[in-house]
């Protein structure tokens, strides 16, 4: 007899819980890819400035 009110309260709580629409998986992957591309561009810029001043610090040996 005590279970019925608890069950009804749980049903009301579940139905009133906020629901978020599912996000597509590709959106997260696109952000990750753009983050990695930005990281590569920053490293390339740093290497270019280093190679202009000191060719010995270049990773490709210019």
UniProtKB/Swiss-Prot annotation:
Tissues where the protein occurs: Expressed by the venom duct.
Record GO cellular component, one term: extracellular region
Pfam families: Chi-conotoxin
Positions of the propeptide removed during maturation: 20-48
Organism domain of life: Eukaryota
PTM characteristics: Contains 2 disulfide bonds that can be either 'C1-C3, C2-C4' or 'C1-C4, C2-C3', since these disulfide connectivities have been observed for conotoxins with cysteine framework V (for examples, see AC P0DQQ7 and AC P81755).
Chief location category: secreted
Record field: transmembrane: none
Keyword Kinase tagged: no
UniProtKB keywords: Amidation, Disulfide bond, Secreted, Signal, Toxin
Cellular location(s): Secreted
Leader peptide range in chain numbering: 1-19
Family of this protein: Belongs to the conotoxin T superfamily.
Protein name from the UniProt record: Conotoxin Im5.1
Species: Conus imperialis (Imperial cone)
